[in-house]
């Protein structure tokens, strides 16, 4: 899955059940909200938070993750959307050092059937409904950018968004 699907190991004796394996989706941004929740703290309410609280999932209180999608951005370009068992690519890179090429159409892959993303399932009317979900995810993200600016790629460590600099 091009670096999206990577292992996550968690150990917290007497809190997190040992020996559990899962293929549920968790994003690195979820760690912030999850760790806050697990330590009894609350996420700041004055800004948008990308992560979702995964503590019920990690603690074994539920079998599914609280995340069903993530957006893959490189610098300021949308590359893909992962939704449930599907990945929708808008750019393609054959090998790690090759240039990324924009696709003329979205390339949809069912990751359980094809984890190496070799065959697209773009047959007309077969997976078109997946694009509806991808478009909703992208639209929600674009709307969030209108509410709060993104931290630009390469921003200095002391970067402060305008919203907070003016306060």
Please describe what each predicted stretch is.
Residues 9-10, 28, 128:
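Active-site-proximal cap/loop segments of hydrolase catalytic domains
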Residues 1, 16-20, 24, 29-116:
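C-terminal cap/loop subdomain of S1 sulfatases and analogous C-terminal strand-loop tails that border
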Residues 5-9, 105:
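Catalytic cores of eukaryotic secretory-pathway lumenal/extracellular enzymes that build
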Residues 31, 83-89, 94-95, 101-107, ...:
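Long, internal low-complexity/basic segments
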Residues 3, 51-52, 131, 138:
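Alpha-helix initiation and N-capping motif
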